[in-house]
Amino acid sequence: MKQFLMIMVMIATAFISSGQEANFTGKVKDEQGKALSGATISIKGSKVKTQTNTNGLFSIKATIGDMLVVSFSGFSNQSYTLKNSNPIDIQLSVSNNDLNEVVVLGTRSVGRTKLESVSPVDVFDLKTLTSEVPQTNLTDILNHVAPSFNSTTQTVADGTDHVDPATVRGLGPDQTLVLINGKRRYTSALVNVNGTMGRGSVGTDLNAIAAASIDKIELLRDGAAAQYGSDAIAGVINIQLNKNIGTGKAVFSSGANITTYQSYKQAAPGSFKLGETYPCQFCINDPKYYNNSVMDGRKTNASVNYGWQIGKTKASFINVTLNMEQREPTIRSGERTGDIDNRKSGDSASNALMTALGVDRNYFQMRVGQSRTRNLQGVINGALALKKGGEFYFFSILSNRVGNSTGFYRMPYQNSNIPAIYPNGFLPEITSNINDISLGTGLKGKMGTWNYDLSNTYGQNSFGFNIENTLNVSAYYNNQSKQSEFDAGTLLFRQNTTNIDFSKKLDNAINLNVAYGAELRYENYQQKAGEEASWANYMRKTGGVTDVLNGTPTSIKLADNTTGIPAGGAQVFPGFRPDNAKNESRTSTALYVDFEMEPIKKLLLDFAGRYENYSDFGGNLSGKVAGRYKLSDNIALRGSLSTGFRAPALQQRYLTKTSTVFQGGVAYDDATLPNDSKAAQALGIPSLRPEISNSASIGTTLKINKFSLTVDAYSTKITDRIILTDAFSGSATGDAVSQLLYTTLLANNAARGIFMANATDLRTSGIDIISAYNLKMPKKQSLKFEVATTLSKREILGKTKVSEKLLGRESTYMSPINKATLIDGNPKVKGYLSLSYKKDDFNLFLRNTYFGEVTHIEGGGTTNWFYVQVLSPKIVTDLSIGYKLNKSWRFSTGANNLFDIYSDLLVASRGSYKRLDVVPTSPTYDKFVESQSAFQRGVVNNNGISSNNQFNYSRRVTQLGMNGRYLYARIEITF
């Protein structure tokens, strides 16, 4: 009987103890034994979860018999049933399945996967992508893997040739916030001012960050200003740097564009018929077109990455990346058409001059295509584990880029040339020196029961302009100066951001996670003047003495035998004047709060609010509510409503410059004047206001085994979108406003003035569809399919917000070209289908990317006629094949744009276009009138449309670029 009672007591004790909660501790590590910081441990069937500290250690309240589920980004989930109270040692294995990828973007809670997030988040494994895909820089990679992301190199666009603008969901480059390791990244000092994508915006230079230094990228496709602050209207990009230790990789790749592009021949009037648009691609025997086979754009990239453990714990580390890339230019211009001799018109005069010079029409070809660049980058990422689970972390990114691009060719007897210096004319060059410096440091850990994160991030971008192979026409006429190289000045932007963040998961019925924090940000924009000869007009005289600032322009006989005022400043890019110099600063403070909860089973809600106050324009309050409802283990619904804003950039407020712009082959000096200038005030243009956004999204997620599908519909309305106007011109004999404008422009060495203004409202809406399937394969094989697409619509709402003094001049305030670039300059439909196959040491990657139609619009100038061409959709194929030669060496080769696809050629005849009547009250630009006039019918008149056959492909819109097929080879060495 005693034995029976003893057994019953033991059973009862075990039963009682099994139902009691206790603290269970353990450690999570990878296959090499390295501690995994940030791994999520949850109790299956419960809302209870925790996260490992920097040493991989965790503690969780549970009971004997509970099943723990351990997850970490890039690793397979592992389950563990609690059998006793002994410390738990869990080792995770690397996974090829990214369906359970844990994200930190869009949530301040821990352990959310991208399918569990209340907002759509894409996760891109850069370590895999940089081994598989042909692209090497960040914007190129993202342009082919994220349908909602668009970016291509720009051409003949001043500084924008050297910094690729990037957009999300077709909005502006400045409406997407970029984070590094969760901390705000600064923007470029450059404002995009020429007639290409992102005109008037200030973006972030993603290519200043070496792709080899990145572990993964998260792309939040939802308004998030209430969570992260200004700029997060279209979404947020979070770049997470490498943390690996004890292993390294060196990569060398080289390739070139081996391609055939088409261009028009010099042709006689009437050889193109009305309605004839562009030729079929590769019409080899068509006498109207050249098929130009070239090999150019050679690119060489070398990088090395390695991580070291610091001290005894693997939670303390430093990871270093060095990267170098040399990129040569591409040329996609055609045989120059039109007059060669500006003194006389007609082919006879042109042929006679070319014979005398010993050249042909191709000699005067422009360099239309990608610029030449050389990039040097260094990236450091590290952390030091502190006692009691704390961590000191740091990261730094250094980058230097030297770029070289060109402008329009100056013909031998054009007024912008001096034949005594350049008998054959010249192609002026813009050489950039772009430097990026950033340093982020922080301290995080626990303060009582709260998690804290105190950080400071500093960053700056400088953009120096050196103008080469050029001249100052007025300097030669003044004192026979033959100076051909000029320091045109420097732009500088600096930003310092200090954050303090707190968060806590409350152990209560609704599983509430509370986060709050504050931010202090300082910004400074500087514009440094160039040397005098870069901007001065030396033919401005006072009493016969040169007076470059206040003198009266003197007319003389110019190169084309006409009499006029010689141009001042360096041709292609006149430098910044001393009175253009700026040194402007501002501060902003912010407070935010975020509540994430599960009020009922299967429902996750998130509420966020943020108040920001700027020293230059005041405050803004943004809010967001988002939710996710789990219909079953496999299907969930999610949606969000949010408000947001974007503060006008200091660069937009204070940029002052003069640039040479061509319309219809005619050169103009355009002055971009500050928003607070006398000229802007005279025109009634108000001070810049923040852009305000209202966003809504609804979607669904599906996960069945190794298949996932997300479908998200969205709509974002933006009020008071900031744009760069077209050029206003004044008159010495006009009304008071016109006279003041004339005087102000003349003082800026320009004939026309451009301004920043809150000019319009717009809406973008669409659907994003993303699916992935990891096919079950035999051992040592894997096969993954991905299909993704975005369908979007952008529209301008209401009338242009023109000032009262400019009523009737809406088409200058916001031209049809500007409208077209905003709403039709990016593909509204874009998608891809990719296949990735691996077997043992062999891998194959195949991807087809669909770029939808875009609209090119040209015209204006001295007429009210605009010409519209819709460029048809294209499919670009990428292919790469790789083989692991041994334990350390891997070789791969392949192609970007395997079948050498180009956008449609711009049409050669104005008769091929539709005429657009300018309707000032029309919010769009789609009121066409088919013209049958003799001027348009059957006449080759592409000189004005494509600038003498130099722009065969559109430079205004962003579809798929204009480089053609790119072939490459890559060697990777792991050590």
Residue locations for each model-derived region?
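Short acidic/polar hinge/loop motifs at secondary-structure boundaries
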Residues: F58-K61, R184-R221, G270
